[in-house]
Amino acid sequence: SLMRQESLFDSAITSSAGARGLMQLMPATASEVAANMGYPPNFTLDDLYLPVVNIKLGARYLARQINYLGGDMMAAMAGYNGGPGNAAIWQELSRGDPDLFVECIRFDESRQYVIRIYENFEIYRKIYELP
């Protein structure tokens, strides 16, 4: 759902802000995550257009968001788009209520992002007959 929202599965896309690839990683974020992982050894920003590299780095960055935000997937998605510090504030304001959390997101882009990811998730759940 996140990848669909970020790039519509286009591995060659670059956003107007400079985010690259399937999971739309910003170069500075990707470089920092790659350095922390030691992956790949001769990482360049052009590697962000390689699905295997982009997904691995994006998944690691998302895992950091999930960990930082106490396992709260909705907050992690908001943090992926709007920054982890902002997501932590919205999480605190909403006191665990997912509907209130969405309303606490102060950036319209991030609010719509979270809503669309969950809509996509429900569609995929039905398509693939997942519980």
Residue ranges of model-derived segments:
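Catalytic glycan-binding domains that act on GlcNAc-containing polysaccharides
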Residues: 1-131
